[in-house]
Amino acid sequence: MEENMEEGQTQKGCFECCIKCLGGIPYASLIATILLYAGVALFCGCGHEALSGTVNILQTYFELARTAGDTLDVFTMIDIFKYVIYGIAAAFFVYGILLMVEGFFTTGAIKDLYGDFKITTCGRCVSAWFIMLTYLFMLAWLGVTAFTSLPVYMYFNVWTICRNTTLVEGANLCLDLRQFGIVTIGEEKKICTASENFLRMCESTELNMTFHLFIVALAGAGAAVIAMVHYLMVLSANWAYVKDACRMQKYEDIKSKEEQELHDIHSTRSKERLNAYT
């Protein structure tokens, strides 16, 4: 009988421990982190492959070659964008971990408001710093989303020209890279519907794949923006809770101090009355 009672108490203790651990998880920050990682993964992975597909399309169908020397051409710009993608992936992987850690500490501070946990001034400054940094990153991701929409628009135009060529017989349409700013005005790199390269490009799966990769990358950038907005809401709410917790702690400290003073006064008066009586 005693063994069963001890076993039941042990199971109850484990269950309470699990409930306490689950209660300390910052679920809002966890959802935002998952959304951020998913968005960054889609943007970086699909964006990198879409840029590689763009290089192959330019070299294969437009017969565009790399410029010798240190001249800044479209291929050099694409390489720079790839390195930027590597940096974005690494930076936001670390930033997501930092925000999760901040969420755990803030949740612990709120849960242990009436315990021994003390919210320091440094912790409040870190929360405010994360709010400011997340807001700047949200603006940056808005810019990235707007910039990613440009290749989507370009590939949509190319896809439309290919579709119109197949639907309208005898249509004479040309695609000039100068109108997209890919080459300089002095260079003439265009293909028309009558050329073999244009027909091969429209029939290839590479064009369709690159177009859809850019669309997915755009969706990933949009998901990152939503994650940043979610983080801002979470951080702002945590900041408000922590601020109220600090005020509550000050109130409790003042109240305890006043009660102690009243107790000391009553004790002193009781001693004086006792001495006077004796």
From Swiss-Prot:
Residues with PTM Phosphothreonine: T278
Membrane topology: Multi-pass membrane protein
UniProt keyword Signal present: no
Tissues where the protein occurs: Widely expressed in the CNS. Found especially in the granule cell layer of the cerebellum but not in the molecular layer or white matter. Expressed in the immature embryonic retina including the nerve fiber layer (NFL), inner plexiform layer (IPL), and outer plexiform layer (OPL). Weakly expressed in processes of Mueller glia cells.
A Pfam family of this chain: Myelin_PLP
Chain ranges on the Extracellular side, renumbered to this chain: 44-84, 149-213
Keyword vocabulary terms for this entry: Acetylation, Cell membrane, Cell projection, Disulfide bond, Glycoprotein, Lipoprotein, Membrane, Neurogenesis, Palmitate, Phosphoprotein, Synapse, Transmembrane, Transmembrane helix
Compartment(s) where it occurs, according to its Swiss-Prot or TrEMBL record: Cell membrane; Cell projection, Axon; Cell projection, Growth cone; Cell projection, Dendritic spine
Modified residues (N-acetylmethionine): M1
GO-annotated cellular components: axonal growth cone; dendritic spine; filopodium; glutamatergic synapse; neuron projection; neuronal cell body; parallel fiber to Purkinje cell synapse; plasma membrane
GO biological process: neural retina development; neuron migration; neuron projection morphogenesis; positive regulation of filopodium assembly; regulation of synapse organization; response to bacterium; stem cell differentiation; synapse assembly
Molecular function via GO: calcium channel activity
Disulfide bonds: C174-C192
Entry-annotated residues carrying Phosphoserine: S256
Cytoplasmic-side positions: 1-22, 106-127, 235-278
Modified how: N-glycosylated.
Domain of life of the source: Eukaryota
Bilayer-crossing regions: 23-43, 85-105, 128-148, 214-234
Glycosylation sites per record: N164, N208
Subunit organization: Interacts with OPRM1. Interacts with palmitoyltransferase ZDHHC17/HIP14; the interaction leads to palmitoylation of GPM6A.
Family to which this protein belongs: Belongs to the myelin proteolipid protein family.
Chain's role: Involved in neuronal differentiation, including differentiation and migration of neuronal stem cells. Plays a role in neuronal plasticity and is involved in neurite and filopodia outgrowth, filopodia motility and probably synapse formation. Gpm6a-induced filopodia formation involves mitogen-activated protein kinase (MAPK) and Src signaling pathways.
Protein name: Neuronal membrane glycoprotein M6-a
Organism this protein belongs to: Mus musculus (Mouse)
